[in-house]
């Protein structure tokens, strides 16, 4: 099984460089790794409740760990055991499937590129920053972190004049988690009238949490990305999981590419396990709180989890650091070694027809971990207060820049603003703020 050569194409032809024999995805990896946006992740906090502690993870270390897990998932998907379920579904020999499908797996360079890039569009102060920018862009296409990642890769990062990092199609396809336009999936734009009678200082996260998709501003590059797909594949790729039944319902697309499915599993595993580790180490969660998850895990369908969760829990909260690391390693290994192949029958394009997945009983375990982190870490009052403070800061900062941009924006940003249309001017201010780290946003706010 071969991959269409169009997936290795770039929007702009790369200038030739003497003796540069790197394959396309290694070039992509290098561009992401050396970008300013990637470096900025070192100053964006993964969990805001953690506070000042040398142990905690940043968005940068999180991305490195996601890359490591992603590479391990690719290795798992080369093993014959990962084809058992697919072979049963298709009534084919798993050795034959292994021989065919190994050829379409991403290289380590490619999967690391996706994992390095997956968070680079996320704004300062997490969900609070995202809500602030979505509210301030409510009349101009909205804001969402994954959409900003695509925009940064295809337009903003100054590797080319107008094509961002000028990455290969396949790399960009792997980064797109939600192949739709944001203003179609985001509920605020489907209530008839956008509510404006709210003091921007008191915008509720529940009212302005964005949907998922690509900015309409970046539609041209999105359409170029999907050119190799048949009309049927393109239509199916953008299909939602269900139709909107309430005005405030966020819509999500149903399908992802093979590479994206691997990256997203790696991200979920890192979030569920490593963020839990951070929270345990610095005391954000207690052994008593963890028992609520243990009770659910003890009743799940995974035999290994049922048998080991008691001893794993003791190790997770042990004062002996090596015991906790062993427990974390065992959990990560459990998730990785259960990844298997999945088929989406409606597609003809191999990169969409096949995905990575976890069995239902393992997803059940992963979701218990994710819900615990969400409930006791992300929704922790300290996290929410920091994110709310950041939300107010970014909202006010946007208003300040919008009031006198030529005076207050950096020179290059101000020049771009001056040449832009009214809608594009708002997006330029949004791009500038979204690219800030937590610490830099705080410094700029204090200067203003």
UniProtKB/Swiss-Prot annotation:
Keywords assigned by UniProt, alphabetized: Hydrolase
Pfam families registered for this protein in UniProt: HD, HD_assoc
Keyword Hydrolase in record: yes
Stretches assigned to the HD domain: 59-272
Example of a GO biological process term: dGTP catabolic process
Molecular function, one GO term: dGTPase activity
SUPFAM superfamilies given in the database record: HD-domain/PDEase-like (SSF109604)
Annotated spans, Disordered: 1-26
Biased composition (Basic and acidic residues): 11-26
Family (UniProt): Belongs to the dGTPase family. Type 2 subfamily.
The protein's name in its UniProt record: Deoxyguanosinetriphosphate triphosphohydrolase-like protein
Organism: Histophilus somni (strain 129Pt) (Haemophilus somnus)
């Amino acid at each position: 099984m071969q991959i269409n050569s169009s997936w290795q194409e770039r929007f702009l032809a790369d200038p030739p460089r003497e003796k540069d024999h790197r394959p396309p995805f290694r070039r992509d990896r290098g561009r992401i790794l050396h970008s300013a946006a990637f470096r900025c992740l070192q100053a964006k906090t993964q969990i805001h409740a953690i506070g000042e502690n040398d142990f905690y993870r940043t968005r940068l270390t999180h991305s490195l760990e996601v890359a490591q897990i992603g590479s391990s998932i690719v290795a798992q998907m080369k093993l014959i055991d990962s084809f058992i379920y697919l072979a049963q579904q298709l009534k084919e020999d798993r050795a034959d499937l292994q021989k065919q499908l190994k050829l379409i797996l991403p290289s380590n360079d490619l999967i690391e590129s996706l994992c390095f890039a997956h968070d680079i569009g996320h704004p300062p102060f997490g969900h609070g920053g995202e809500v602030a920018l979505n509210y301030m862009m409510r009349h101009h296409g909205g804001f969402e972190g994954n959409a900003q990642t695509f925009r940064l890769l295809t337009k903003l990062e100054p590797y080319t004049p107008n094509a961002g990092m000028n990455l290969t199609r396949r790399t960009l396809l792997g980064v797109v988690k939600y192949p739709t336009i944001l203003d179609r999936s985001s509920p605020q734009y489907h209530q008839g009238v956008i509510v404006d009678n709210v003091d921007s200082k008191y915008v509720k996260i529940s009212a302005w949490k964005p949907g998922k998709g690509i900015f309409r501003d970046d539609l041209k590059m999105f359409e170029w990305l999907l050119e190799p797909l048949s009309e049927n594949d393109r239509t199916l790729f953008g299909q939602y999981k269900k139709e909107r039944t309430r005005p405030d319902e966020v819509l999500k697309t149903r399908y992802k590419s093979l590479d994206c499915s691997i990256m997203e599993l790696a991200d979920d595993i890192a979030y569920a396990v490593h963020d839990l580790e951070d929270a345990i180490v610095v005391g954000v969660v207690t052994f008593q709180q963890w028992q609520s998850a243990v009770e659910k895990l003890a009743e799940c369908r995974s035999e290994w989890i049922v048998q080991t969760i008691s001893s794993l829990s003791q190790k997770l909260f042990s004062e002996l650091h090596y015991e906790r690391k062993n427990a974390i390693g065992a959990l990560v290994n459990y998730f990785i070694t259960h990844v298997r192949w999945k088929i989406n029958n409606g597609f003809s394009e191999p990169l969409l027809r096949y995905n990575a997945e976890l069995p239902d009983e393992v997803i059940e375990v992963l979701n218990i971990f994710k819900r615990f982190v969400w409930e006791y870490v992300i929704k922790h009052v300290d996290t929410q207060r920091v994110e709310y403070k950041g939300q107010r800061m970014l909202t006010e900062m946007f208003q300040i820049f919008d009031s006198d941009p030529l005076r207050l924006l950096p020179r290059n940003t101000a020049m771009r603003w001056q040449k832009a249309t009214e809608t594009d001017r708002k997006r330029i201010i949004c791009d500038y703020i979204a690219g800030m780290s937590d610490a830099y946003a705080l410094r700029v706010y204090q200067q203003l």
